[in-house]
Amino acid sequence: MIVTNFAYGTGPYLRTTDLAIAFNDELQRNKKPRMRILVPWVYGEKQRRVMLEEFRDYDLGYPGEILLDAELGSMLRRVFYGGGPYRDALEKWTKQCQTVSQETHRHLSGRFEAQTLSGGTVEVNGQDIAVELSRSPRVRYDVAPSYFSSFAYVGEILERASSIALHRVGRDVLRKGVEAANWVEEHQTMRFIAYPATFGYFKTWEPRYPGDSLAPPLVPPTRSNTENIKPGVFVTVTGIPGLERLYAEATRLGIALYSNEHEQVPGSERQSPHVIPNKNILLQFARAGWSSIWISMLAGTPLVIPPFDLDDDPEIHFNNVSVKELELGIIYGGQTLESLIMEGPRLKESYDNIKRRILEKFDTLDGNRYCAKL
């Protein structure tokens, strides 16, 4: 059995599941049996809905292979950032990291129940866990060899954050955060850091731990989308000052608004992120998380991100710098929608150049398959 371990948010649980699927496909290609995939069920029915939307076809082909563990999810939720000032979440994590790690270890070492994506109940024996696949994990399970893949080390992010004044996290809390992150991150069997990613704008890459390797973007290749939709903008981030004006401008220009959270975007139509590669999606508005950044880059759909909020995770500050320096998107600063759309050709050319460099280095754009083979 494979167990996944990830950070807060939607992208991490989707992308670790993608990696687990790639791992299983590689096992099958080598004539070895596939393994069940145990996913922490952190976000309740919303997570199940999102995973069904993302992996419906896969679940039909391999029914019951993906399992959701609510008890494990509730443990991770206690150390996750879930809104409010990041400093509060960081302080909570530093205090509970080792305690929650011990709890997850005990849980995963025994017998427990999990659910299939379709809602069936399955009894699981933790002794069957053979491998852990993690993405920027916040705890240690210590039940099987752990394979780490991420956009950066949290320990390095917090170390570098202590030297800038662009956030509201005290140095003492940052220091404790570095200690907690190092305790988790140094205990990994194999490690991959993606390119481009959080510190991709550095001129040279230096491994943090012996055996560190670079990998292509840790998302599946985007699939073409030919749905007949009106020209529009896909919105995956809300609550940013000024976006309401852009929504009104879109209406005036006859440009549609699409979102997977359409209740939070006035006048929008609900669509899955799978439409982002559609030629009629003119822009994607998203927080600077790497799932969104890589999807825009691979799809060739220009990305617009909000400026860094001083109360947010310092990772986002460095992500924004990388997006700007590598020409992966535009930081929103009150521009008109028309001016943002006009930046599209420049960004698409930049995306093509970056993809060419990735292919020259790795011979693939698919970081999950790349890591699974190693």
What is the predicted role of each segment?
Residues T4-D18:
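A short, glycine/small-residue-rich beta-strand->loop->alpha-helix junction that serves as a flexible
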Residues R15, L19-A22, P210-V265:
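Conserved catalytic-core segment of nucleotide-activated headgroup transferases in glycan assembly
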Residues K32-E103:
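Conserved nucleotide-sugar phosphate-binding/catalytic loop shared by glycosyltransferases and other
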Residues K32-G44, R191-A197, A256-E261, V304:
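Short internal beta-strands
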Residues Q102-P137:
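Short N-terminal targeting/anchoring amphipathic segment
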Residues V131, V139-S213, E325:
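Active-site-proximal region of nucleotide-activated glycan assembly enzymes
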Residues Y258-P302:
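Donor nucleotide-activated moiety binding/catalytic core segment of transferases
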Residues S291-R356:
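Catalytic binding pocket for nucleotide-activated donors in carbohydrate/polymer assembly enzymes
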